[in-house]
Amino acid sequence: MPADTPAGSAPARFDPAQIEPKWRAAWDLAGTFTATPDPAKQKYYVLEMFPYPSGRIHMGHVRNYTMGDVIARYKASCGFSVLHPMGWDAFGMPAENAAMATGGHPKDWTYANIAEMRAQMKPLGLSIDWSREFATCDEAYYGQQQSMFLDFLEKGLVYRKNAVVNWDPVDMTVLANEQVIDGKGWRSGAEVERRELTQWFFKISDFADDLLSALDGLENWPEKVRLMQANWIGKSRGLEFAFARTDGGDPIPVYTTRPDTLMGASFVGISPGHPIAKALAAQRPEVADFLAEVARGGTTEAALETAPKLGFDTGITVRHPLDPNWELPVWIANFILMDYGTGAIFACPAHDQRDLDFCRKYDLPVIDTFFALDDPTPVGDTAFVPPKTEPVRWVEHFAGLDIATGQEAIEATIDFAEAAGWGRGVEQFRLRDWGLSRQRYWGCPIPVVHCDKCGVVPERKENLPIALPYDEDGRPIDFSIPGNPLDRHPSWRDCACPACGAPARRETDTMDTFVDSSWYFARFTAPRAETPTDPAEVGYWMNVDQYIGGVEHAILHLLYSRFFARAMHLCGHLPESAREPFDALFTQGMVTHAIYKTTGTDGRPVYHYPEEVETTEEGAVLKKTGAPVDIVPSAKMSKSKNNVVDPLAIIDAYGADTARWFVMSDSPPERDVEWTASGAEAAFKHLGRVWRLAEDLRRNAEEAATAGSAEEARALARASARAIAEVTAGIEGFAFNKSVAKLYEFTNTIQKSKAPRAEKRAALKTMAQLMSPMTPHLAEEVWSMLGGIGLVAEAPWPEADPALLVEDTVTLPIQINGKRRSELAVPKDMPREEVEKLALADAAVLKALAGGAPRKLIVVPGRIVNVVI
């Protein structure tokens, strides 16, 4: 064994329990993964979305962080200066819930969980620079967050207003629209209510157009994520005009994206939060009762879309803008949002299902404004809502249209209204400002003070951080009482005004936890800096070159982070180049497992852990009783369904490399992977086979090097070159499963080869380098066994000799509609069908197809691939 690698005899068998800790200690001793800026090197910043410290890692963590680790290790071997950090998204309600349940403290619970999870993650062998670790509940972190809040406030990016909010009655806090799922709180599951409170908001809407247009430049993001964000931002062009009231009251302005359907208007609807509704409620008890009833429903579009339609006839009428003799009733309707458009609409039930349901319920008229070209049947119980691009036949359209698409009619109507002087075309966005106030203890305090003399006063930066109190004047904080403990903490709450020194009161709301995760990527570049970022460090490390995480964060976290990067740039904390913080995004699939269930005596399903079940040729049975078990294949791992696999148990039984190898091997990383015991066993056996190959070559190192033919040696060299090329391509293209498949094949080739032992040793050392990103511990062991110098983690990535690839491969240009867009390196003798499969999997082809199929796919063997769309 070389002198600069860990001492100790090689094990007599493949023993991960002996091998893996040894090499982790070696990496730590050498400081292998310490990120250091080096102007002479190109940098690479790889980041996985950091975890919430629940106290236990799961297989999803293993897959997610292994993916990032493969990229980080590969890039380091390619000569990049790599930043691969880890931290903890540590604020939030679960810690307070735990305190309520156990009588403990959220801080103690959180930091204990962090220690547990760190200890569980380190055995995975991740190439993380742990010296940069932080938790968002660290005072040093949220103190800098408070400093940025004050910067945002100074720039006009934060403001305070009364707003109807989503109130979670169980967690007793406000939820952002994105945190309300099907009308329920995303954590508690409670029915969300409407309440009007004074809240703090980030002015994300100021950036709506920029956030939307910049999506086109995110070419290395999944198209589905960009589409989800575009839909959430929701840019639309419509008509703004006002209905004149017949009683002489103030006109009612409306905004509509379908002004072409104005002749089908049935009523004017106003939001429960509209000034007219509020004024009526103050005068009429029946209106106040109605508003109280609808306040018990959710406030989001999704919640209101599915909720029963409720309305109240105000008795007010308005005049139609095209016919002053045509009067429309004004209804308060629970499905109308106050913070989109003007809080008032006109309803066209024939061409909007929501409006139609409302009109059928309250017996209001339904007027068709257009029909399908071949079907003049009036609307029944289903609204006729064709795509805007589909031509339809119009019923006496006031702009003179007969047959036209909806989009053409919209533009014609806007032109008509502007020419007539009663309306104007405007653009609107669905994206609304981000309400960040939360009525909870375990979050970042908002650094402002309320003074009777001065009003709302920003805290002085020299007083930051405004730290959370650990106790209440020496007594434990009682988290069992509903509400925010900070409201009940006078020694923390009561303070001097930073402006005049008079008695004042701290803001007791804390920040939404999505604030914490909206800038952590920048903090990792200089986690101990006395300012939010350090110009030199952030200038070197940003942007994040590769970001990895679940698609469930497409709207909440990713959109907020894009906003924060822009706001941080405006305040001088990020350079212009970092306004889009993530250059590339990869959204991984889940780790799944079969569900095993029987039926209980009460008829309800009983779920069983995988270790309680034995699978036979006839099916599955319980080990204890032999009772038959129903199997639900490949479901998301869930504690409630008992189909979870404990990563720690897998590591204890097989080693971390087996877990890493399996989650990389079985499926493309963007798809779900099903964990099976047989798959884990097969992965372990394969790694043992690689170890035995190395052990055999180590023990017989002195055998004559002349054994084996020159042709066998050349064949093995060609196989090594192909393995280097294909494993490299797989890692570069996030096709880790293809890299693993090639390494399986390469193992077989080495094992069967009759080449001289020196050549086999060289091939297996190459194998160790290629396996290092996936199975780093075994790779180090094999590298050491075969006389490799230093650590394989620090060895340069092998390069394939082009001469050894020439005779076996050919590069085919890929033309899309006659223009060269990509190329494909394939074996010369690859069947046409295999070339077609690879061509259809090419990134440029996938992007051009956009989920569709090509009209033609023409492969000219050895020359070109033509894709016709």
Swiss-Prot record:
GO term, biological process aspect, one: leucyl-tRNA aminoacylation
Localization terms from the record: Cytoplasm
Residue ranges of the motif 'KMSKS' region: 636-640
Residues binding ATP: 639
Coiled coil start-end: none
Keyword Protein biosynthesis found: yes
Assigned GO CC terms: cytosol
Keyword Nucleotide-binding attributed: yes
Ranges spanned by the short sequence motif 'HIGH' region, renumbered to the chain: 51-61
Keywords, ordered alphabetically: Aminoacyl-tRNA synthetase, ATP-binding, Cytoplasm, Ligase, Nucleotide-binding, Protein biosynthesis
Chief location of this protein within or outside the cell: cytoplasm
Reactions the enzyme catalyzes: tRNA(Leu) + L-leucine + ATP = L-leucyl-tRNA(Leu) + AMP + diphosphate
Record Pfam families: Anticodon_1, tRNA-synt_1, tRNA-synt_1_2, tRNA-synt_1g
EC number from the UniProt entry: 6.1.1.4
Family from the record: Belongs to the class-I aminoacyl-tRNA synthetase family.
NCBIfam families linked to this entry: leuS_bact
Protein name: Leucine--tRNA ligase
Gene: leuS
